[in-house]
Regions:
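Cytosolic, membrane-interface loops and tails of multi-pass inner-membrane proteins
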Residues: 1-2, 51-66, 117-133
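Lipid-exposed faces of alpha-helical membrane segments in multi-pass integral membrane proteins
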Residues: 14-20, 40-43, 79-82, 104-108, ...
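Transmembrane alpha-helical segments that form the membrane-embedded catalytic/substrate-channel core
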Residues: 48, 107-120, 171-186
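Helix-coil boundary and interhelical linker segments in multi-pass alpha-helical membrane proteins
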Residues: 24-39, 79, 83-104, 149-166
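Topogenic membrane-insertion module of multi-pass membrane proteins
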Residues: 1-52, 176-195
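C-terminal membrane-associated helical module and adjoining short loops/tails
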Residues: 127-195
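Hydrophobic, well-structured mid-protein blocks that either form specific transmembrane helices
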Residues: 94-140
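Multi-pass membrane catalytic core of lipid/isoprenoid biosynthesis enzymes
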Residues: 11-16, 57-114
C-alpha cells in the first residue's frame, strides 16, 4: 500500500509537466516577462497535446486509475488553459471592470467546459473506450495556440489597441468553450507523418 494518495506512473508525467509550465507562465507574466509567459503557455499546450497518447499506451490501467487520469487532466487543464491565460491577459493590461468581468467569464467557461468534458468522458469510457474523435466546442487547449498567435500582433499594433483587442478575443474564446459544435480532434500521428 502506498503512503501517498493518487496514482503514480508514467501516464501522468506530461500532465504534470504541462501544469509546471503553466505555473511558470503565470510567474513570468506577473514579472512582466510576457515572452517567456507565452513560451511556457505554448509548452503547456504541447505537453497536453501528447498526454492522451501516453495514457493510451498503458494497457493495464485500473478503472480507478482511468477515473483519476480524467480528473487530474482536467484539473491541470483548468490551471494551464483557464487560469494561466487569464493571468497573462491581466498583467498585459486586460484590467478595469470590463476586463476583469471578461477574464472571470473566461475562467468560468473553461471550468464549465472541463466539468462537462469529465461527465461525457466518464460515460464514454464506460461504453466505448479508446480515443475520442470529436470535441464538443473549442477545447481549452486551443488558447495555447490562439493567444501566442494573437500576441504576434503586438509587433504591428499600438499597445493600447493590442490590449483593447484582447478583450473581445478572450470573450469570443470563452463563448466557443461552451458552444456545442463538433470539432474534429487532430490526429497527431497523421500530422507528424506529414511533417
Amino acid at each position: 500500500m502506498s503512503r501517498f494518495i493518487g496514482f503514480y506512473d508514467y501516464t501522468v508525467i506530461l500532465t504534470y509537466v504541462s501544469l509546471l509550465a503553466a505555473v511558470s507562465s503565470m510567474f513570468y507574466a506577473s514579472q512582466g516577462n510576457f515572452f517567456y509567459a507565452i513560451l511556457f503557455l505554448m509548452l503547456s499546450g504541447l505537453c497536453d497535446a501528447f498526454d492522451g497518447a501516453v495514457v493510451r499506451s498503458k494497457k493495464d490501467r485500473t478503472e480507478e486509475g482511468k477515473a483519476f487520469g480524467i480528473q487530474i487532466d482536467s484539473l491541470c487543464d483548468l490551471i494551464s488553459f483557464g487560469m494561466a491565460p487569464a493571468v497573462f491577459c491581466f498583467f498585459v493590461g486586460v484590467d478595469g471592470l470590463a476586463g476583469r468581468l471578461i477574464l472571470f467569464f473566461y475562467c468560468l467557461c473553461a471550468v464549465i467546459r472541463l466539468a462537462y468534458f469529465n461527465v461525457l468522458e466518464a460515460q464514454r469510457q464506460q461504453t466505448e473506450g479508446g480515443a475520442n474523435k470529436y470535441y464538443h466546442g473549442l477545447p481549452v487547449t486551443a488558447i495555447s495556440i490562439i493567444l501566442p498567435l494573437f500576441c504576434l500582433l503586438q509587433h504591428v499594433l499600438p499597445e493600447h489597441l493590442f490590449v483593447a483587442l484582447l478583450h473581445p478575443l478572450m470573450l469570443a474564446v470563452a463563448f466557443l468553450f461552451i458552444l456545442d459544435f463538433p470539432v474534429k480532434k487532430p490526429n497527431l500521428r497523421n500530422i507528424l507523418s506529414n511533417v
